[in-house]
Amino acid sequence: MRTHFCGLVDETLIGQTVTLAGWTDVARNLGGVCFIDLRDHEGIVQVTVEPVAGDDASAELFKVAASLGYEDVLQVEGVVRARHAVNDKLRSGKVEVIATRISILNKAAPLPFHAHENPGEETRLKYRYLDLRRPEMQRMQRTRIKLVQALRRHLDARDFQDIETPILTKATPEGARDFLVPARMHPGEFYALPQSPQLFKQILMVAGFDRYYQIARCFRDEALRADRQLEFTQLDMEFAFVRERDVQDFVEDMIRAIFKEVVDVDLAAQFPRMTWAEAMRRYGSDKPDLRIALELVDVAELVKASQFPVFTAAADDADGRVAALLIPGGASLSRKQIDEYAAHAAKYGAKGLAYIKLSETGEVSSPIAKFFSEESFAALLKHVGASNGDIVFFGAGGYTKVSDFMGALRLKAGKDFNLVADGWAPLWVTDFPMFEWDDEAQRYVALHHPFTAPAVDDIADLRANARTAVSRGYDMVLNGNEIGGGSIRIHRPDMQSAVFELLGIGAEEARAKFGFLLDALNYGAPPHGGIAFGIDRIAALMAGTESIRDVIPFPKTTGAQDLMTDAPSPIAADQLAEVHVQVRPKQV
């Protein structure tokens, strides 16, 4: 139906007859001439219709052109000629196509929005097929496509094996809530959709496949936000007979090569490395954005002599923290803006936010100054590096909570004060804690997942020091986004059983949920490790958008709905009966 793509028609085709197909982006009838911007996935070319006096065929052609509306689907035949007025905004802007025939393949109904408009998100998602026609959306989807193609080429060339793993599998606790699928042939029993291929890829290492990858669809029934979806895509990888640096060096080279190929970005020749403890201490985050130069400063020792009980209690607590965040030029914040910072910190667990503001003339404004002697107050300001015109925020309380809300303030201040440097800041975060304590459940939970190997090989040592145990986990961070997470896995069945026990998973429960894994580890499992990269998140970074919904063709809303297909939706009673499911009536 076509000989060329619209966006690729150029000067080399001048004088030639071409057949094009696409959508009417814009149609303009200027009386004596019609101009049609014809669009396909490669871009736009101008089609010109010039009636010839006394020529019935050209008059009919002009009549067809004059009747066109937005998004009508056309086939156009014509001759390429040089344009009198060049349009530098188009690749085809030096030429136009003089139409000799126009066929309307399909008329478009009146549109809810035009391809060059940017309507509200609900409208965009309801008419996603129209939204995806917009040039910006085409660009972002193409970025994602190029990313996946480049990853496949890179791994195929290095002897990785692309192996599929099951979508219908066993429900196993991996942190988030499972999506469950009733098993019609086994009444009362359910499959789960995979949160990741984690256990299957480990078993593939036991099976001797050595190097595995998969562009895997994963499912987690969790709250949605800009960087999370119920279903998402990850590059899943696993290596046999490796240590941490083997995996890290390989995937660092891969990510560097992929960014160069897909978006022509040169990432650092060597990614900096930082332990989890250092990242939390300096930045209040295990995925710090290194483009922001601001750092947290511990001030517990300097506030112990104060008379402020919130500070002294946290400073004297072995699990407490008193941290300061200096914002250069922050004295410009009004009281209302300071209250907004306090409200922002409260979202992350802060019960209050102290501050010291120094005017350009050195005048102090602070609700906590009265609790310090003149000498200790001066020492505090010197320690944090405060100068006239600055503001210092303080957080006090439990170490983790203070780190979280002060880290959130750091990000807010970086954006508010234009302190986010241009460019790309990759980072390895290593040596994560093996466990974290869940106050509600009164037990340890795995910080990564239950299959991450501890840094120690001795089970007695792990049991005796579970609270401070370090794992062999690692994350790759880019511009404050965790784009990849991995670890060396547990390959010994006795160590895996011990970790289950520390997580409150008894032998009977472990056998019921993970018996297949424990059995596999018993039959000669090699040391192995891997990593998984979030395709959606990397594509969003490459495309320059903050929401992964922009790089997913058919995403869900934050309310977990597909507005285009109206999913989820009720199921007929006979279908429910077939899978032995009875739905409780909604509570009014």
UniProtKB/Swiss-Prot annotation:
Residues that, per the record, bind ATP: R220, D221, E222, Q229, E482, G534, I535, D536, R537
Catalytic activity, as annotated: tRNA(Asp) + L-aspartate + ATP = L-aspartyl-tRNA(Asp) + AMP + diphosphate
Keyword Lyase in record: no
Top-level class of the enzyme under EC nomenclature: ligase
One term of GO molecular function: ATP binding
Key words, A-Z: Aminoacyl-tRNA synthetase, ATP-binding, Cytoplasm, Ligase, Nucleotide-binding, Protein biosynthesis
Listed GO CC annotations: cytoplasm
Span list, region Aspartate: 198-201
Location(s), subcellular: Cytoplasm
Domain of life, source organism: Bacteria
Gene Ontology BP term (one): aspartyl-tRNA aminoacylation
Residue sites binding L-aspartate per the record: E174, R220, H448, R489
Entry-linked InterPro entries: Aa-tRNA-synt_II, aa-tRNA-synth_II, aa-tRNA-synth_II/BPL/LPL, Asp-tRNA-ligase_1, Asp-tRNA-ligase_1_N, Asp/Asn-tRNA-synth_IIb, AspRS_core, GAD-like_sf
EC number assigned by the record: 6.1.1.12
Function: Catalyzes the attachment of L-aspartate to tRNA(Asp) in a two-step reaction: L-aspartate is first activated by ATP to form Asp-AMP and then transferred to the acceptor end of tRNA(Asp).
Quaternary organization: Homodimer.
Family: Belongs to the class-II aminoacyl-tRNA synthetase family. Type 1 subfamily.
Descriptive protein name: Aspartate--tRNA ligase
Organism, scientific name: Xanthomonas euvesicatoria pv. vesicatoria (strain 85-10) (Xanthomonas campestris pv. vesicatoria)
